[in-house]
């Protein structure tokens, strides 16, 4: 009989340190809260210090040990500085969640090269920057878990989202390559692919009528940031110790049924 502990416990991440990019608001902040409420010490980063300060205050109010760093994930030097500060503050880095993302709906005919590049740079290049720096500064020698936030809309394509589906498809491919190369070092790399989440800025930008969009999935509702964050928790934890290179789709089955064609 195994002596492995159940994953369904409040101290699942006790003793671990997690970094969440784009962690000041929305899914990133909820992910930091969920990881922290399960015992992790949490560092968050994004570009706006005021948002980071408010987020850390909220996390600390819940008894979570938290810190922040101002960082543009497109800049390798800033990413490196933030990870070095996490290591100085907490002494280790066990979990990296690449959540920073950009999004805005626009038809391809109106999408500028700079607009396309901006989203690819934040989503894909940012994921590369953070993952590579974390690996070189800590994970290569100590192991750990990387969870990359992607999407499911790239599986079929979606109107008004050419820049996003391109970036997310790149994240999927990058994640699998990292899983293969870094597995021998004890580094697991997995993907969470969320669908529409109620109340998030992404949903507000993409769909004015969130309920109409959500009803396209078999569960007939939008998801919540908590439901997605709990998927991240699983992949970040030792409960997923034999899982790498995998994608956990958390979209109510929408990728099976939703049309990418606008109404």
Question: Could you describe each region identified by the protein language model?
Answer:
Residues 131, 167, 175:
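Active-site helix of classical SDR
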Residues 136, 180-184, 241:
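Alpha-helical segment proximal to the catalytic Tyr-Lys
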Residues 17, 24-26:
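Conserved glycine-rich cofactor-binding loop
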Residues 2-9, 156, 233, 244-263:
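Short C-terminal tail/terminal secondary-structure segment
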Residues 107-108, 115-120, 203, 213:
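Substrate-binding pocket helix/loop in short-chain dehydrogenase/reductase
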Residues 128, 221-250, 255-256:
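C-terminal substrate-recognition "lid" of short-chain dehydrogenase/reductases
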Residues 97, 183, 188, 243-245:
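Short, small/polar-rich loop/turn modules that mediate ligand/substrate recognition or access, typified
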């Amino acid at each position: 009989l195994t002596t492995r502990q159940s994953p369904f416990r409040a101290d699942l991440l006790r003793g671990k340190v997690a970094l969440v990019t784009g962690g000041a608001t929305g899914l990133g902040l909820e992910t930091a809260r969920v990881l922290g409420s399960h015992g992790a010490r949490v560092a968050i980063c994004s570009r706006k210090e005021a948002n980071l300060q408010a987020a850390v205050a909220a996390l600390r109010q819940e008894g979570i040990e938290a810190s922040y760093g101002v960082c543009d994930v497109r800049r390798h030097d800033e990413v490196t500085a933030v990870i070095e500060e996490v290591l100085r503050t907490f002494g280790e880095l066990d979990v990296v969640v690449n959540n920073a993302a950009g999004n805005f709906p626009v038809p391809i005919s109106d999408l500028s090269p700079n607009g396309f590049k901006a989203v690819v740079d934040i989503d894909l290049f940012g994921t590369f920057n953070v993952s590579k720096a974390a690996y070189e500064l800590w994970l290569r020698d100590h192991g750990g878990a990387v969870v990359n936030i992607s999407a499911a809309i790239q599986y079929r394509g979606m109107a008004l989202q050419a820049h996003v589906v391109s970036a997310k498809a790149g994240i999927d491919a990058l994640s699998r390559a990292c899983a293969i190369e870094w597995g021998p070092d004890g580094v697991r790399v997995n993907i969470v692919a969320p669908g529409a989440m109620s109340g998030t800025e992404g949903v507000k930008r993409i769909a004015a009528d969130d309920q109409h969009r959500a009803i396209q999935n078999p569960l007939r509702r939008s998801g919540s940031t908590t439901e997605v964050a709990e998927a991240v928790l699983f992949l970040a934890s030792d409960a997923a110790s034999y899982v790498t290179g995998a994608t956990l789709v958390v979209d109510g089955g929408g990728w099976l049924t939703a049309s990418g064609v606008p109404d």
